[in-house]
């Protein structure tokens, strides 16, 4: 490709680093990377004997969807009351037991929604309601006003940014002044809501992942002391990766440091809130749970500011795929998707994990062949054990989970385009029409499909595959195509031969001067009708034909008739029928 094809790009033309191996010919680019500092020069992580790498995920953390607050703030068009209510009802139906419902001091819509929960039975008794507030007296008072009368458990979630850049540039405070501001906010929360028996408290040191570990530990310990955290009334300490800045192992180290050094650890629910700026929010959350986190905040399908909050649906289904109960129901993921798209007015990408339109779809020929064989083995194993297919271990290649677990069918698992092979083609014909092609016919038909997709550049549907198959092998509707009746009388250019089997038909053909060697006959069906597949040799080489019928004899007769039609170069032949 010429350098002028993309004139807005500057192809790297610097030197090849002296340390680069001979096989790596990348050159230094013109990207201004020198403007940025790596995370290790911005914040220290005093953890050297980390334990999280040897741990395993064996149970789900407490999932806390923040779609109605954090996710809602990120929408170009925030949810109206009807959409907020619909989303809340979805979260309850899925099984979430702690839901952040809004920022009542920031908007009247959020305040009114919290009051709706107070005035109705929309929130089941076992669902905890979380409300969000900055550490400001007037906003804390407004927040607590919104929750009065709610009989459900309530969490008042207070936050303040603590990282150096935020302290100095945004808030204009040093460490001591910010500590005082946070504790003043904590006292206001205690003054306004401390006597409410169903209320617990949560604190988030915003931008935790860029805050000095000793400072954030000092503040968190001061908050749990102020709020008198006990095992009976634990405090949630939520540690956000507000802007993702490092590889997930760094965040895991930071979480483990807090987990191992917090005071009153048995009275703390350690929570995380990863974002996805580097595209590794999922990994950050999973490693954080290994490191000691017990609670994860995020959004269903990952909506949120910039590149989004961590996707708690993907996190849950990752556990499901490892044999761990996610404690949330995804049995109709397409209904969940429709609701989330309606409420957020944001479409979900076709490749989004688990929920995207194409995540269970294979176009690649090698993938299709493996999936087809895996599904066949799965069915056979279930039949051999005499148990339903849904009850045996899932081990189909390229499909991490059974699509049926989340309400998907197998209809879209295999789709055919120019990258596809015989396995996918055969699978579609079998799944849509009940037609099982023998391997040699799969190979032959794949050549015709490849030519068709190369010519059109389009995906081929199952209906189009069958139309192409009919044109190539059945030859139905052609003016010169011979026909066979129920008695297997074969008309070839006015010459009538009779036969009750493929071998006899072949012999009859030879008696009338048609040299056709029948190599094999296979029997299958097409939408309930009998279908015969005949492999034969004529002057043009080895070929295939097909015929439909109400009886096996009629189907075979029609298949031989279709074979005779294109036979133009007679060759010496010996009639032979081999079992298919």
Swiss-Prot record:
Lineage: Bacteria, Bacillati, Actinomycetota, Actinomycetes, Mycobacteriales
Cofactor requirements of the protein: Mg(2+)
Protein's UniProt name: 2-isopropylmalate synthase
Any one cellular-component term (Gene Ontology): cytoplasm
Binding-site list for Mg(2+): 70, 273, 275, 309
Species the sequence originates in: Nocardia farcinica (strain IFM 10152)
Localization: Cytoplasm
Keyword presence, Glycosyltransferase: no
Main location as per UniProt: cytoplasm
Principal EC category: transferase
